[in-house]
Amino acid sequence: MQGILGVFGAAGRSRFAATIAVVLVMCGMFAAAASPANAQASRADRLAQYRAWMVEAKAMYPYPQTIDKMYRVMMCESSGNPNAVGPQGLYLGLFQYHRGTWGGRWNPYRTNNIYDAKSQIFATAKAWSIGMQSHWSCYYITAGR
């Protein structure tokens, strides 16, 4: 009895072994990409991007609070998760917008996806620039300006 690979001959077995080796290497690469260390790096990169967008948004929509204050509110509201869904599914995204608030005429980003992180950051800067800080309970429980 030759075994299942015996029917391929030496050349076929060699190609099969090479294919398996490539698959195993690729699986290892994907496993490395999904490792906790890489997940932490990508989270850190994402949070750094959010802070950079906050700088841009504040330049476009000046408000009196610091960028650190906006960052703290975001972390309080969603822990930096753009796909966060609050209790009972009423509040969504980085800054936990209610769909009714998000769709308000004040919001130039209202036609964008409510889960879009950049849109939420810019909408929040716009909201703060027109005095809507009271819409976030985390605004009052995070320290500093």
For the regions a language model picked out, list residue spans one by one.
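Catalytic cores of secreted/periplasmic lytic hydrolases that degrade extracellular macromolecules
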Residues: 140-145
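Export/targeting segments at the very N-terminus of extracytoplasmic proteins
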Residues: 28, 35-80
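Substrate-binding/active-site groove segments that recognize
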Residues: 89-107
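Extracytoplasmic/secreted proteins, especially bacterial periplasmic and envelope-associated proteins
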Residues: 49-52, 65-72, 92-97, 119-127
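Secretory-pathway/luminal and periplasmic proteins that interact with or process carbohydrate-rich
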Residues: 78-85, 131-136
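A short, structured beta-strand-centered segment in the mid-to-C-terminal lobe
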Residues: 110-119
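N-terminal prepro-regions of secreted/extracellular proteins
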Residues: 1-47
